[in-house]
């Protein structure tokens, strides 16, 4: 009977372990181990038709230094297999350097925003409806990405090498996506990242090794990009003047004008040696030019009784105000919800973190180390990239730090595809989206410049649906509409609507001969709307796979229940069958008898009474607890033993939450030079504009 009981217990344990529903994908499919099935607010705030399929986790790149990149991927389960969106992968990067792309996921282009209850709510302008979007925390150490101390990256080519390693690992997890069209999008210092990554991809494609597949790079979208640092900084004073933020009556006007002239001389020196193959030291030192913005913000502080949060111009949206010396670091205000959301242990578990580090919007340690002192600014890469890849440079018109004026300045100096700058920069097309004028466009020779009205440094934060239409421009899904003999509009449509071909407001009596040439192959078909019923193969696969998994799990669970019942029955039968006579025979000698003392008889009676009060389960557990060979007199556990159990529990409660050392090195809470990151200042290194003279040694980051 004892052997039977042990067998039953072992079988019960093994079967129970097998019956624990695994995280979907812990089988042979590597993708499923990254599946995200729950988040705070997901099931109560997000409509079923809108819920994306999500994958997230830390992918190991280099085991020797524990480098892992965190990604969060969103895909639309309702997309049609014949839709252009079904074979599109969009990699989104935020800036810094050292600022997390979770800003993009939860404040800009992702399907969710975070509310004051720290739960997800819907973002109706999510880009995942136009293609799979993958948000990546990089370089190593940014956001939820991780690396060993002292293994920080320093230069742009190294960053690109690491990112291609991430792509290699990513396509090992999702091999079915390797033939997808690839788009890179991002903002701020991503204006340095994206061109370098694109250049590395094109070089890889040109020298494929055996077994490698080409990456189908289709387009780059750079928003308010930090592409040509000194040229961008040269635009600050003209921008302030143009928008009536400062005038010649300001007490610091002459000081500001002097710095602007010095910056102009630096830029002139850079331009004279732009085509040199050697790095220009003047181009690597942008402290003087960048310092102009710090002085402009200081010179325009409102001290005449203004509220504390209204004293300084917001450098990311000049129509807004902030406290001094923040000048924008407290914006967007939803960041105060995003930070605790991503620091929630439950959320970290939902996102499949292997290293439970504390999330920071921007890492000062990463930013300080990534100084790019051996890298050409990415503006030098644009001419060669434009030979092969279309590039969109879009700007929120209200941004100061990476404003559209600075972008146009470096574009007009750039030589690409046989000519310099835009031949006719005044030939602007009004951008009409969903029958509203949202900006203007200049297009020539694979380069598109877009200035977007009523938007900030973070265009998708302000205008999510308009920002999503940038992908329609990137994929040529737009119409050119004649307004009159000299003016035209660029027209995009709501999600899922295909372009109609060339439309004229006052068409002639006979159709234009070139109408057909502007119509896409899909324009003759009915508008391709996203079906709410969902007809994609991926959605069908998910729908069909889940019931199968559930059925298997239920069968295993049923088997476990039957085995448990059987085991309990055997244990109960064993308990009922134990010898009960007062005089017990000794198994070793049939003639000798073991006499029970009177106090023992009383104890047996008390136990019998107690056992009658216990239920079936309690009796069974008593059977488990009975010590073999000691009967009712099994030795009680000592106090020392109990203390050991408590000590063991205490030791087991380890904390692995924060792999970023909270030391002076992080300098969290310190304010420095204004930063060029996506949507905020580098909260660890660049928050003190009052000490700009000393802190200007640190690179102002986007």
UniProtKB/Swiss-Prot annotation:
It is a single-pass type I membrane protein. Keywords: Apoptosis, Carboxypeptidase, Glycoprotein, Golgi apparatus, Hydrolase, Membrane, Protease, Signal, Transmembrane, Transmembrane helix. Glycans are attached at residues 65, 124, 446, 454. Residues 501-547, 663-702 are annotated as: Disordered. It catalyses: Preferential release of a C-terminal arginine or lysine residue. Residues 511-538, 686-702 have a biased composition (Low complexity). The active site is at residues 188, 399, 457. Residues 20-554 are lumenal. It is found in: Golgi apparatus, trans-Golgi network membrane. Residues 1-19 form the signal peptide. Its main location: Golgi. One of its GO terms (biological process) is apoptotic process. Residues 576-702 are cytoplasmic. The keyword RNA-binding does not apply. It holds the Pfam family Peptidase_S10. The chain crosses the membrane at residues 555-575. Belongs to the peptidase S10 family. Protease with a carboxypeptidase B-like function involved in the C-terminal processing of the lysine and arginine residues from protein precursors. Promotes cell fusion and is involved in the programmed cell death. This is Pheromone-processing carboxypeptidase KEX1. The lineage of its organism: Eukaryota, Fungi, Dikarya, Ascomycota, Saccharomycotina. The gene is KEX1.
């Amino acid at each position: 009977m004892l052997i039977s009981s042990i067998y039953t217990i072992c079988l019960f344990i093994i079967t129970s372990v097998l019956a624990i529903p695994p995280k979907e994908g812990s089988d042979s499919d590597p993708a499923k181990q990254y599946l995200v099935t729950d988040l705070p607010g997901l099931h109560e705030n997000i409509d079923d038709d809108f819920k994306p399929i999500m994958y997230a986790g830390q992918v190991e790149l280099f085991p020797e230094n524990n480098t892992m990149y965190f990604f969060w991927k969103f895909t639309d389960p309702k997309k049609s297999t014949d839709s252009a969106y079904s074979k599109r992968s969009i990699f989104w990067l935020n800036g810094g350097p050292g600022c997390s792309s979770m800003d993009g996921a939860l404040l800009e282009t992702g399907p969710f925003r975070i509310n004051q209850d720290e739960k997800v709510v819907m973002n109706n302008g999510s880009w995942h409806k136009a293609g799979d979007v993958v948000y990546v925390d990089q370089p190593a150490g940014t956001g939820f990405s991780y690396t060993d101390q002292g293994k920080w990256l320093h230069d742009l080519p190294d960053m690109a090498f690491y990112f291609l390693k991430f792509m290699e690992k990513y396509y090992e997890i999702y091999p079915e996506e390797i033939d997808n069209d690839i788009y890179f999008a991002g903002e701020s210092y991503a204006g340095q990242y994206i061109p370098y990554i694109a250049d590395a991809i094109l070089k890889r494609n040109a020298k494929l090794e055996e077994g490698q597949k080409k990456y189908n790079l289709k387009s780059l979208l750079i928003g308010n990009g930090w592409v040509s640092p000194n040229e961008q900084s040269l635009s600050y004073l003209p921008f302030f003047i143009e928008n009536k933020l400062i005038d010649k009556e300001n007490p610091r006007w002459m000081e500001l004008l002097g710095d602007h002239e010095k910056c102009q001389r630096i830029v002139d020196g850079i331009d004279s040696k732009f085509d040199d193959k050697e790095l220009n030291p003047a181009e690597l030192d942008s402290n003087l030019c960048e310092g102009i913005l710090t002085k402009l913000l200081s010179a325009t502080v409102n001290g005449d009784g203004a509220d504390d949060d209204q004293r300084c111009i917001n450098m990311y949206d000049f129509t807004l105000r902030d406290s001094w010396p923040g000048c924008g670091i407290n914006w967007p205000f939803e960041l105060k919800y995003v930070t605790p959301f991503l620091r929630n242990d439950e959320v970290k578990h939902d996102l499949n973190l292997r290293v439970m580090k504390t999330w920071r919007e921007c890492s000062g340690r990463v930013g300080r180390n990534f100084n790019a002192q051996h890298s050409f600014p990415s503006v030098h890469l644009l001419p060669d990239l434009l030979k092969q890849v279309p590039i969109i440079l879009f700007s929120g018109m209200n941004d100061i730090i990476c404003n559209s004026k600075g972008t146009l300045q470096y574009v007009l100096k750039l030589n690409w595809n046989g000519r310099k700058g835009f031949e006719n920069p005044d030939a602007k097309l009004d951008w009409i989206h969903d029958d509203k004028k949202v900006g203007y466009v200049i297009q020539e020779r694979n380069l598109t410049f877009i200035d977007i009205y009523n938007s900030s440094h973070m265009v998708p934060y302000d205008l999510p649906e308009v920002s999503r239409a940038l992908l329609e421009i990137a994929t040529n899904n737009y119409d050119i509409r004649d307004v009159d003999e000299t003016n035209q509009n660029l027209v995009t449509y709501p999600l899922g609507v295909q372009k109609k071909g060339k439309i004229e407001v006052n068409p002639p009596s006979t159709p234009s001969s070139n109408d057909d040439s502007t119509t896409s192959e899909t324009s003759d078909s009915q508008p391709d709307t996203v079906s709410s019923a969902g007809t994609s193969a991926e959605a069908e696969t998910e729908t069909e796979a889940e019931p199968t998994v559930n059925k298997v799990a239920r069968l295993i669970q049923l088997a476990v229940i039957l085995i448990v019942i059987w085991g309990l029955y055997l244990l109960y039968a064993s308990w009922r069958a134990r010898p009960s006579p007062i005089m017990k025979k000794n198994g070793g000698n049939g003639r000798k008898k073991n006499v029970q003392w009177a106090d023992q008889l009383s104890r047996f009676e008390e136990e019998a009474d107690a056992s009658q009060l216990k239920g079936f389960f309690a009796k069974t557990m008593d059977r488990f607890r009975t010590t073999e060979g000691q009967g009712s007199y099994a030795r009680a556990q000592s106090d020392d033993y109990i203390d050991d159990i408590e000590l063991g529990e205490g030791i087991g409660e380890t904390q692995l939450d924060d792999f970023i050392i909270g030391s002076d090195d992080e300098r969290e809470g310190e304010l420095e030079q204004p930063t060029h990151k996506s949507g905020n200042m580098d909260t660890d290194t660049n928050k003190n504009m009052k000490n700009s003279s000393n802190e200007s040694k640190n690179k102002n980051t986007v």
